[in-house]
Amino acid sequence: MPSVDDVLEQVGEFGWFQKQAFLNLCLTSVAFAPIYVGIVFLGFTPDHRCRSPGVAELSQRCGWSLAEELNYTVPGLGPAGQAFPRQCRRYEVDWNQSTLGCEDPLAGLAANSSHLPLGPCQYGWVYDTPGSSIVTEFNLVCEAAWKVDLFQSCVNVGFFVGSMGIGYIADRLVGSSASWPPPHQCRLGRPDAVAPDYVSLLVFRLLQGLVSKGSWMAGYTLITEFVGLGYRKTVAILYQTAFSVGLVLLSGLAYAVPHWRSLQLAVSLPIFLLLLCYWFVPESPRWLLSQKRNTQAIKIMDRIAQKNGKLPPADLKMLSLEEEVVTERLSPSFLDLFRTQNLRKYTFILMYLWFTSSVLYQGLIMHVGATGGSLYLDFLYSALVEFPAAFVILLIIDRFGRLYLLAGSNLLAGAACFFMIFISHDLHWLSIVAACIGRMGITIVFQMVCLVSAELYPTFIRNLGVMVCSSLCDLGGVVAPFLVFRLTEVWRGLPLVLFAALGLVAGGMSLLLPETKGVALPETIEEVERLGRKAKPRDNMIYLQVKMPEPAGL
């Protein structure tokens, strides 16, 4: 009986049908980018100072320039270590009193302005930006600055819950295309733009996370199931590269639309176009076969043949899953991930790699917004380096193997973060170059750890293993905002110290995994154990054929 891969070899492994489905699903990957990293623009914190009643009138009466107004009325202006008093405290002075002069108005109140009492910003803030963000609208600064971190953490909590929930729905209840939820992603993106208060914004952000990553994962799985074996690696990498296209588009869109509500609408409304694509993506024939819906699977394979201009094989009606030859099916259990010594080691290492890849990836993106340069250009530069990262993977993965590429990329990202610690604040361009190098390294890690995870687990717990390990990626995204923004307040280089340590340790731990290049996917836990003892690629095996002499007289 032919399998799906056997039929694809005859009707086209990457023909017109697959290309059309690939393009449609890539739109989902593009649309996911603003949700994943939109915090850089939605939560941008501009320079700010306390609003003091009477200052504007006094400045106008005295004819002060902006620099003079700040010098006379804002405490702690100047020294780098005085950011908190400058942005979060005000002089407790009645600026409306007539005794204040225009030349150093505070001189008559105290010999030194540092002796004047300071108070909280009870009248709000003045923000030095022509646009707006959730920070400027809801005053998420000073003592409330942690609420920006919570805003980003909420979407990652949604990723964590939603990816498992939609994965369960896709596997248990409906087909992959039916679980592909761009309509819900669009509906839940629009309320963000009209949220009346901060609490409502958090709720909508959480709900958006529930469906958005599941949408991306469903598309990833679906397109790899439609193409032949020889195209799966390339298609998977290019699907993730479409996410990078979304990053580039986001930087230009954020520059053109500097107001956060309008930006949120701009990135949500185009998802309506995905509704048109939704009807052109059928269910996965592999999933249909696993649900014993062979007739529907055969119809879809026949449709693929017609779209590709090929004739379906004569034995198409006997289409089946390769797994059907197995008479006994094992039931996966969470404990199976830790059942043996090698499997335990691989699981813990992969969990750490998923966690660190998320922390470094999101951390480097958010760190760009805290460096003080051109937010839009810096974001664009760091997004562009993801394209050569995909090219590097396609070029050398089959030549050098998985482990060296995974370990080397982790070490590169960690070393780049370590180097950034010692770069002077005046050399902003050098800091961006180092950040881009680190970003390229961690982008490679993100794509490689997904591949290695799938290749190390035996078949009956492969989906479970990848799901559990990748959930650490979402947990990393939950803590990353707090690590970046709160540690930066202590010392600008402190997040980089942590990122460097995580990346360098991850590089060393990657070498403890077995090489899977050219090795058949393990079917049982016993095969995983043998893989750990001697991870010899199939390409290095030598087969000898012994020809026996023919018996005499024949």
UniProtKB/Swiss-Prot annotation:
The record marks D474 as: Important for interaction with positively charged substrates. Its main location: membrane. One of its GO terms (molecular function) is organic cation transmembrane transporter activity. The keyword Ion transport applies. The chain crosses the membrane at residues 25-45, 235-255, 262-282, 348-368, 377-397, 403-423, 432-452, 465-485, 493-513. The modification Phosphoserine is found at S333. It holds the Pfam family Sugar_tr. It is a multi-pass membrane protein. Residues 46-234, 283-347, 398-402, 453-464, 514-554 are extracellular. GO terms for biological process: (R)-carnitine transmembrane transport; acetylcholine transport; dopamine transport; monoamine transport; monoatomic ion transport; norepinephrine transport; O-acyl-L-carnitine transmembrane transport; organic cation transport. Phosphorylated. Signal peptide: none annotated. The record marks C450 as: Involved in affinity and selectivity of cations as well as in transport activity. Keywords: Cell membrane, Glycoprotein, Ion transport, Membrane, Phosphoprotein, Transmembrane, Transmembrane helix, Transport. GO terms for cellular component: apical plasma membrane; basal plasma membrane; basolateral plasma membrane; lateral plasma membrane. Residues 1-24, 256-261, 369-376, 424-431, 486-492 are cytoplasmic. It is found in: Basolateral cell membrane; Apical cell membrane; Lateral cell membrane; Basal cell membrane. The keyword Cell membrane applies. A motif (Proline-rich sequence) lies at residues 282-286. Phosphorylation of the transporter leads to changes in its substrate affinity, resulting in a regulation of the transport activity. In contrast with rat ortholog, ASP uptake is inhibited by protein kinase A (PKA) and C (PKC) activation. ASP uptake is also endogenously activated by calmodulin, the calmodulin-dependent kinase II and LCK tyrosine kinase. Inhibited by cGMP, most likely through a cGMP-binding protein that interacts with OCT1. Belongs to the major facilitator (TC 2.A.1) superfamily. Organic cation transporter (TC 2.A.1.19) family. Involved in the uptake of clinically used drugs including diabete treatment medicine metformin, neurotoxins 1-methyl-4-phenylpyridinium (MPP(+)) and iobenguane and platinum-based drug cisplatin. Also involved in metformin efflux transport. Metformin competitively inhibits OCT1-mediated thiamine uptake, leading to a decrease in hepatic steatosis. Plays a role in the anticancer activity of cisplatin and may contribute to antitumor specificity. Electrogenic voltage-dependent transporter that mediates the transport of a variety of organic cations such as endogenous bioactive amines, cationic drugs and xenobiotics. Functions as a pH- and Na(+)-independent, bidirectional transporter. Cation cellular uptake or release is driven by the electrochemical potential (i.e. membrane potential and concentration gradient) and substrate selectivity. Hydrophobicity is a major requirement for recognition in polyvalent substrates and inhibitors. NCBIfam families: 2A0119 (TIGR00898). A large substrate binding region with partially overlapping binding domains for structurally different substrates is formed by several transmembrane helix domains (TMH) including TMH 2, 4, 10 and 11, and it is alternatingly exposed to the extracellular or intracellular side during substrate transport. Contains one proline-rich sequence (Pro-Glu-Ser-Pro-Arg) that is required for transport activity. This is Solute carrier family 22 member 1. The gene is SLC22A1.
